[in-house]
Amino acid sequence: MSGHSKFANIKHKKAANDAAKGKIFTRLGREIAVAVKEGGADPANNSKLKDIIAKAKSNNMPNDTIERSIKKAAGDLGAVNYEFVSYEGYGPKGSAIIVEALTDNKNRTASNIRNAFTKGNGSIGTQGCVSFMFDEKGFILVDKEEYEGDADELMMIALDAGAEDMSEEDDCFEIYTSPDDFSAVRENLENAGIPMAEAEVTMIPQTFVSLTDEIDIKNFQRTMDLLDDDDDVQNVYHNVEE
């Protein structure tokens, strides 16, 4: 699992950027809508919705906004039907990029994402062309400033909760689970009073690519900026070391 802290930093930067643009709540609202459509409006019987609600709260989404999103999706009152789509492609130096989106217009989304790759001198590939370079894992981040215990104590709690592994970084602890066990582990940690700064099922790069050429760096950032600006895009995973 070494090297994942770089990925966590990438995700933190994206989250901070989204919050500054006022887009993070829109993206979370779409995730809530899809979860409700798939499994119902009761988080007690819908683990996916329960996980997204926890994620929304960790991003400071107001409770009334969360409730409105759930009721809107459950009642079909003006609700938009979003469809999950994913794209895989290449950035500079063969770097791997995975884009996940929720959209009500697949043609629009495909065009925008293709443009983002092209503007950065990259290209969209076929499904599966880069996903084999990533591992799907549950990822839980515990900020050392928020957690008062020590590493050994947290390791015991995490493993007892069903986690696969844990690593310690300079300012945080990173806990990993299988995708199937993520919901149970997150809930067990929550019940144990463990503060979680981040908790989600994500794609972790097996190896990283380093960009040293200034043009490559600018092209890659151009693609990332365009994807960040797209309201349809929910998640972007890549293996570029920043």
Q: Where on the chain are the PLM-derived regions?
A:
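N-terminal cationic and glycine-rich segments that engage phosphates or anionic surfaces
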Residues: M1-G125, V130-F139, D181, E241
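Positively charged, low-complexity, intrinsically disordered RNA-binding extensions
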Residues: F139-E242
